[in-house]
From Swiss-Prot:
Its cofactor is Zn(2+). Substrate binds at residues 65, 68. Its EC number is 2.3.1.286. Its main location: cytoplasm. 2 residues (Tyr-65 and Arg-68) present in a large hydrophobic pocket are probably involved in substrate specificity. They are important for desuccinylation activity, but dispensable for deacetylation activity. NAD(+) binds at residues 21-40, 99-102, 191-193, 217-219, 235. This is NAD-dependent protein deacylase. The gene is cobB.
Amino acid sequence: MPLREAAERVVEAETVVVLTGAGASADSGIPTFRGKDGLWNKYDPRELATPEAFARDPEKVWEWYLWRRRKIAEAEPNPAHTVLARMERDGLLEAVITQNVDGLHQRAGSRRVIELHGNIWRDECVSCEYQRVNDPERGEGLEYDELPPRCPECGDPLRPGVVWFGEPLPSDALVEAENLARSCDVMLVIGTSGEVRPAADLPLVAKSCGATLIEINPSETALSPHMDVIIRERAASAMEALWNEIERLL
């Protein structure tokens, strides 16, 4: 039974780390990007998620991100988020490394979250170092008087605090994630297609350092051939079931 084996590996491990992708938030109603119903099948990322797109039409890009923010603000963390937060509280999980920008891990109670692709709730100035993080529960960052919004420090445009196609990942987040990958005994890989690098390299780094890899995904991924344990379920139901198995072992 993959669930039983996964639970045993987690309980026996000294250091467990998780890598999450869009599938972890899918059961919260957040659309994924890839797959047959993915956002990139409906929208062209070159028109919405690149520095060139923002330079060409910042209002259009902001309208897209405000639409996504409103979708996320309506969502609630699902068991894929809440179980991970519980595991961290109980000393069973070192950190969450996420490709997601929705902040649902933090809303569920996770404390150590490494955001590889930024945070959709953050506004950043294109010119100076000004940035702010909006609180959706207080209605912040859901609409602006003008698009693009302007920096209160220098007056230049603000942009969403996410990593766009063609941009490097934040170096501090990537270094922390790589260090966690090298030091963990078990890496749970939840809801990621394994197609976006360098995030997709992290499980391979962990494996090369002796870690057990556990994949939770309803579909086969580019990383599946490297996995030691595979749970072919959606993230929310799989994490609920995994937690039940873990509790039996504690």
